[in-house]
Amino acid sequence: MGYINNNTGYLEHHTLSSRSVIKKNMYALITPDGLVKNNIYGFENCDISILSSPLLGASFTDYIITVKENGRNLCGIGNESEEIFLFVIEGSLLVYNDNEKAGLTAGGFFFSPASFKLYFQNNSNNNAKILLYKRKYKPLNNLSPKTISGNINNIPYKNFEEMDSVFIKDLLPANDFAYDFNFHILMFKSGAGHGYLETHIQEHGAYILSGKGMYNLDNKWYGVEKDDYIFMACIFF
């Protein structure tokens, strides 16, 4: 149900329900069903939904966006204090800031540091589906992050915590303190899972790119599947 699934209006033999769960300042499971379109200045010919924001309890904002043919943002996203990360889930997109330009395809990503606005446009005949992340940058000493672009298909998986059934690939330098956050892909073989329930200060956003499974949030198990979004808050407020 909802615009993402092209299933709107009156539905026969259907009772209003949702798998989505919202626990402000704790966690959220947001499914594609029920997402509504938002109108945001600068986004032209785009269907956009806000997944998380400071109103939910996050220090960042995540958007899921369908960029239609000739869709674009030429006003620029971000400002002198905001960093931007864009990930292409489907389709292709031209993405650039003031010092780098990249033609991205599915799996492509672009990190734009604070002080550089990010721009994009869809020059293809097909829709592009993207995840967009925006956050206020917290500088450390005189360290300065650089623009980074790439594609996850060119990054090899590594064993996650020495397990042979869970794998990870980092999209940003994990040990460079110029970068105050990271994006990574986790891949689980069938039946695999984390070795323990994580309890830590870091907050997370997570987008399920494929498959389905179970996720434990505040000691409650939830079924999750492709295109679901999860927000996990910091354990201290």
Regions found by a protein language model. Name each.
Residues 2-61:
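An N-terminus-focused feature that recognizes amino-terminal "leader" regions
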Residues 46, 56-58, 100-101, 114-140, ...:
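Ligand-binding loop in jelly-roll beta-barrel domains
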Residues 94-96, 102, 120-122, 189, ...:
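Long compositionally biased, domain-poor regions of proteins
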Residues 69, 80-98, 201-219:
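Glycine- and acidic-residue-biased ligand/ion/polar-headgroup-sensing regions
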Residues 37-76, 158-197, 202-203:
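A short glycine-rich, His/Asp/Glu-containing loop-to-beta-strand
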Residues 85, 98-115, 218-235:
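Short acidic-glycine-tyrosine-enriched beta hairpin
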Residues 2-8, 123-166:
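Double-stranded beta-helix
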